[in-house]
Structures are given as C-alpha cells and as structure tokens.
Amino acid sequence: MSRPDDIDVRPIAEAETADWIRALNTGFLRSPEVSEREVADRSSYLVPARTLGAFDNGRCVATFRSFPQELTAVGGASVPADAISNVTVTATHRRRGLLTRMMAQDLAAAKERGDVVATLIAAEYPIYGRYGFGAATHSTEWTIDVPRTGLDPRWSGPGDGGRIDLVDGEDVRKAGPELHERLRRTQPGAVSRDERWWQVHTGVVRLDRSPWTEPFYAVYRSASGEVEGLVSYECDDHWGDAKQPQNTAKVNWLIATTPAAERALWHYLCSIDWITKVRTGWRAPDDLLPHFLPDPRAARVTTHADWLWVRILDVVRALEARTYDGSGTLVLDVVDRHGLAGGRYRLTVGPDGAVCEPTTRDAGLTLDVGELAALWLGDASAVRLAALGRVREQQEGAASVADALLRTSGRPWCPDMF
C-alpha cells in the first residue's frame, strides 16, 4: 500500500483526462469504460486548473473539480461561488486523506480568487461538515394521485387569459435562460445555469453515461404573451391489467416566475389524458404545489432531503450581501478549524442595510462556520441548533435575536443538481 505522501494530488494534464474519467466512473460505481466522445465532451468544459486528481504510480485514484457559479442570497443579490462536483475516491485508496488534500487545495484557491462561498450537492450527509459545509437548502418530491386531486376533469387551459403550448428544445433554449435568470434573481439558494446546461437538457449535447430520450416541453404565456413558466416531463407508457392506461408523468424540471404560471403548469400535467400519477421532481420544501389542488392530500411527499451545501469563505461579504427584515445587532464567534473564515464578527442591521465587521466585543453566539452557512440562507433556526448543542449561546436570548434577523418567510431552494 502506498503511503499518503507518495500519492500526488494536483491538477490533471490534458493527456490524463481519460484516466481521470475512468477514476470518476469507478468512484460512482459506473462502468469504467471511457469513450472518445466522453473524453471530448468533458474536455470541452473542464477547467484545467480546477480539475484535480490524486495519482498513485501514475494512475488516477481520486477526482475533484470545481467551476465558477453565481449563488442567490436572501434579497436577490448574487455572490460568486466555488461550485464543487465530481468528488470521488477509489475504494482501494479510501481513508488516506485524499479528499482532505483536494478540498484544501480547492478552497484555498477559491478564497484567494475572492469567492464568497463554496457550494456542492452532497452524495452522503456525513462527509462535508468536517470541511466547514452546512446543509443550507432542502428539497422535497411529491407524487400526485391525479384522480384524488379534485381538479375538474374538463379543464382545458388556464382561465386567467394565459395559455399553455407544447414546444420543442429549440424554443426552450431561446426562452429558458432568461426565464430561469428571472427566477434565480428572486429565489435564495438558486444557482446560475450556463449555456451547456440548456444544451444537455434539450439533447443538443448527448452524454454517453445518460442515454437521451426526448421529453415533452410545455410553456406558459401570460395574457400579455410573456413567458412565465416552462416544464420538461416524460411519460412511462404504462398500462394496467385490464387494458387501462396508468401512466406516470415524471417532471424533469419546472420553473415559473409567477404563481399563475406555476398553478397552470401543474394543472396541465394533471389534466393530460391517461396520466394517473405525477412525480414532481425536486421542489422547494414550502412549494405551493399541494395547495394548488382542491385536495392537497393528493400530493404525497415521497422524498425529503438536504440539497445544497454551502461553505462560507468570506463572512463579512456573505452577511453584507443578503437583506434582513428587521433591525438589530448580533456578535458571532465563528469557529473554522481550517482557518479560512473564522473570527468574531459584529453584524449590525438597520433600514440602510447591513454592516458586518471584525470585533473584539463579547459574542452572543459561538458557532461553527458550517452552522453559519445553514443560517445564512434563512432556512435553519439558531434556537433549534442551540437546543441540539450545535450553537452555543454566550448571552441569553442571542439565538432568538439571530432567528429574528436571519430567518426568512420563504425557504431557500436550489433547483439544480451539479
């Protein structure tokens, strides 16, 4: 067995891309076979300096990459984020500190670049807290039992003057980016999408590892003709024993910038002949969906889990980037064992905005940088975290003050997997 010091952790060279992909596929328990097309495709978007590998005697045994991203803070401001993905360690080389070394390199570079936060979607819950990440958003999936919804089976379109049309991938690529950006600017926790995202999700770029099946696309336009919603969905063509159609519509993604558009698209999906169930895909935990139905119990929660994990790299810029509903002052003692964002900070919130600055004043709360990330987007409760022993009140009532300042009326949501 090689010693950890004998394993080289570094950015990959172009000639090592195929070996890196093989290690990536192996780590995710996929076939290690690598095609020339996959090498060409991944080479088109990998950022060389931010694509790391761990090499043991020239063979790649761990993978890690990051890329630039914009994350929406509470209030709609965007902050630059270091988005992390494709993290694997081959089973033969686990527990040797390879992920720790790759993470340390990447976060140090992100801090130096001026990124405010790092983000990732965690495949396993226990891994990333030790690197200062906290679960900042959650997602919920519902399955709708269409016959139970109470919707009028004669529904034939929105009654608000808007309309729904089926469109093709080209139409989605034209209307989708601007629509999504409008949503992202108002949705804390949402992240930016590049052109490639739209190409992959409309079949322009086809991946060896994910065989492409053309989905259906439907667009909602308001009475004025403005695009306010889009949905991508598939149907499974299932028939029951008595020659009865029992199809399930699986939503790949649905974005809407108004409640009217969201309601109309869900009603449309539930109105399609032969559809008896609708799987919603990953939605915000406080999504309006169940309440768009006359019988909300027809939408049954099938999965609920943590989703976007955030690691704060710059406490001052992160806390000053977001908005707050109230006024007040809070002193936070932020513990960061990796030395990237720790310190004592005084947050002052008033009608003119927020000011955060280092301070020597007594702290009201002591918390790990990962817990601060969970609080930053407004989802977590400092009072609950204190009850769990994950936040320490140094001054009585400080957790309640933190909740009054940091919690939001709507929950953050990240619609994307990356």
From Swiss-Prot:
Acetyl-CoA binds at V87, T88, V89, R95, R96, G97, L98, L99, T100. InterPro entries: Acetyltransf_17, Acetyltransferase_Eis, Acyl_CoA_acyltransferase, Eis_dom, GNAT_dom, NAcTrfase_Eis, SCP2_sterol-bd_dom_sf. Its EC number is 2.3.1.-. The active site is at Y128 (proton donor), F418 (proton acceptor). The keyword Transferase applies. GO terms for molecular function: aminoglycoside N-acetyltransferase activity. One of its GO terms (biological process) is aminoglycoside antibiotic catabolic process. Homohexamer; trimer of dimers. This is Uncharacterized N-acetyltransferase SAV_4024.
